[in-house]
Curated annotation (Swiss-Prot):
This is Acyl-lipid omega-3 desaturase (cytochrome b5), endoplasmic reticulum. A motif (Histidine box-1) lies at residues 110-114. The gene is MAW3. Its main location: membrane. The histidine box domains may contain the active site and/or be involved in metal ion binding. It comes from Mortierella alpina.
């Protein structure tokens, strides 16, 4: 027989689980989709915030590149430190800082793909292609698939990434409705018990580490986390189902960028050594990938955010079901506020990134309860969402994540 304090803790946990389930079910049952039109939302934001300033955008690029150069220059002194005990933490510090700073140009290239960088399509293409190619991102190819994501955000059928799996896809038995709606069924409670007690923290952390490290390149190469397709999909095939025939030349251009950057890295490896290139560029590059996966996953995945089937979905409802989060003052600044103004970005992707924070104030006032901001610490949110956002039901026009 378990000691009394152990039994009490088990009872307390069961009560907490039941309360969480009831609260979540009540929120989902009472949820009413937003009825604002996109024009009503746009009219709530001052017109001057939509004006793009090419010079201002280029200055952001210069600032980011100068910052990267300064961090790189400081790292060149690491090997002069007298002991390994000093060099190891110095390298780790460099990798963390440089990986964080390099996200800035990644975001600016992403803005180019939306046409938010400049009124000039040529300027957008040049800056976007150079910046994304330097980070081994196929600029045109990803910009086109990302555009489809924006057009179908929140839709179970139209989105191309972060689409929830369904109960049947997971091979789970159909959920039996309880006799009394307010009660928690034994099946549902058991489902939550499994999530809490059977899925160990080490398993969750290991899965998160894998996705943060390899999720982005796997998405580009094999469409990992993307929409199901009849055959192998990637961002480098000119005949991939992600693209139309008239877009094939753009895939060729983006592939040229990857080949060019790969050639530069190969040349530098021959001149300085592969290890040197990996230390200065490779590990920060992995850091950039981890940031991108972390940011985008948390923007589109949360237990309280619905997804819609065709009868209830429209563009503005899907755009409103993205989540703003603060990553801290410094990181928000370095990442051009892509994390804490993302709902505004999804509503108006051609709005200049440097106006999105101010525009978010007006957006929040207009949307009211439909504006979503989550202040959960980032690491905790990652762990919670990975544990709790497993699937949605096969039925229903408005569905929420379950586990």
């Amino acid at each position: 027989m378990a000691p009394p304090h152990v039994v009490d803790e088990q009872v307390r946990r069961r009560i907490v689980v039941e309360d969480e389930i009831k609260s979540k079910k009540q929120f989902e049952r009472n949820y009413v989709p937003m009825d604002f039109t996109i024009k009503e939302i746009r009219d709530a934001i001052p017109a001057h915030l939509f004006i793009r300033d090419t010079t201002k955008s280029i200055l952001h690029v210069v600032k980011d590149l100068v910052t990267i150069a300064i961090v790189f220059y400081c790292a060149t002194f690491i090997e002069t430190l007298p002991s390994l005990a000093l060099r190891v933490p110095a390298w780790i510090t460099y990798w963390i800082i440089q990986g964080t700073v390099m996200v800035g140009p990644w975001i600016l290239a992403h803005e180019c793909g939306h046409g938010a960088f400049s009124d000039s399509k040529t300027i957008n293409t040049i800056f976007g292609w150079v910046l994304h190619s330097a980070l081994l991102v196929p600029y045109q190819a990803w910009a086109m698939s990302h555009s489809k994501h924006h057009k179908g955000t929140g839709s179970m059928t139209k989105d191309v990434v972060f689409i929830p799996a369904t109960r049947s896809y997971k091979g789970l038995p159909a959920l039996e409705k309880p006799a009394v709606e307010e009660e928690v069924s034994e099946q549902e409670h058991h489902h939550h018990e499994e999530s809490i007690f059977a899925e160990t923290p080490i398993y969750t952390l290991g899965a998160l580490l894998f996705v943060l490290t390899f999720g982005w390149p796997l998405y580009l190469i094999v469409n990992f986390s993307g929409h199901e397709a009849p055959h192998w999909v990637n961002h480098f095939q000119t005949v991939a189902p992600l693209y139309e025939p008239h877009q094939r030349k753009n895939i060729f251009y983006s592939n040229c960028g990857i080949v060019a950057m790969g050639s530069i890295l190969t040349y530098l490896s021959m001149v300085f050594s592969p290890l040197t290139v990996f230390m200065y560029y490779g590990i920060p590059y992995l850091g950039v990938n981890a940031w991108i996966v972390c940011i985008t996953y948390l923007q589109h995945t949360d237990p309280k955010v619905p997804h819609f089937r065709d009868n209830e979905w429209n563009f503005q409802r899907g755009a409103a079901c993205t989540i703003d989060r603060s990553f801290g003052t410094i990181v928000n600044h370095l990442h051009h506020h892509i994390g804490d103004s993302h709902q505004c970005h999804h509503m108006f992707s051609q709005m200049p990134f440097y106006n999105a924070v101010e525009a978010t104030k007006y957006l929040k006032a207009k949307l009211g309860k439909y504006y979503i901001f989550d202040d959960t610490p980032i690491a905790k949110a990652l762990y919670r969402n990975w544990r709790e956002c497993k699937f949605v039901e096969d039925e229903g026009d408005v569905v929420f994540y379950k586990h």
